[in-house]
Amino acid sequence: MVLGPGIGSPVRRGSMDYMLMLINKEMPVAPPLKHGIVDVRDVAKMHVAALENDTSIGKRMIVTENTYWVKELCEMLNKHGHQAPTFTPPVFLVKFLANFDKTIKPIKPLLGVDVNFNTETARSVLGYDPVPIEQTIRDTSDFLASYEKG
C-alpha cells in the first residue's frame, strides 16, 4: 500500500481511498489483513536511485517500510485525532461473510495471512532507508484532512 502526502487532491481509489474509508468509518471494523506499507516519497527516491545505479539493472527491488495489520494502521490514525475502527473480527467470521458479500470475497484468501517482505536488496543496492511509518501515517492523515477542509 502506497501512502504519504500527495500532489493535488486525493483520488478516491487505491490506497488513499482505503485510508479515507478507515478515517470516515466507511469500514465498520478493521479487517484481519496485513499490508506492506511504503511511503510515496520512498517510491520516488528508489526510482531515481535505480536509474542512477547500474548495479540495480536486472534486479527487482521490494520497498516497504514494514508490514502492518489494519488494526495497527487504525491505531496510528487514531493518534492523529481520527476515530478509525480498532475492532478486528475473527478471521473465520469474515471468511464466512465473504461468501455473501461481494466486496469481501476478493480478499478472502488474504484474511489472517501474516505477510512479510524482504527489502535487503533495495537496502544494500540502493541504500533504501524508509520513512518511518509514524511519519507516513501522520503525513497521509494531514494531507487527507487538509483536502477535506478545502
Each model region followed by its residue ranges:
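Residue-level signal for the nucleotide or nucleotide-sugar donor/cofactor binding architecture
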Residues: 38-41, 68, 131
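Mid/C-terminal beta-alpha module of Rossmann-like enzyme folds, strongest
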Residues: 46-105, 133, 137-150
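Ca2+-coordinating acidic residues in Ca2+-binding motifs
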Residues: 42, 72, 121
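Glycine/proline-rich active-site loop of Rossmann-fold NAD(P)-dependent oxidoreductases
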Residues: 5-17, 50-61
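Residues that recognize and position ribonucleotide moieties
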Residues: 36, 87, 115
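Conserved C-terminal active-site "lid" loop/helix of NAD(P)H-dependent oxidoreductases
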Residues: 97-129
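Glycine-rich Rossmann NAD(P)(H)-binding loop
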Residues: 4, 30-33, 61-68, 78, ...
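A conserved pocket-lining segment of Rossmann-fold NAD(P)-dependent short-chain dehydrogenase/reductase
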Residues: 2, 8-9, 16-38, 42
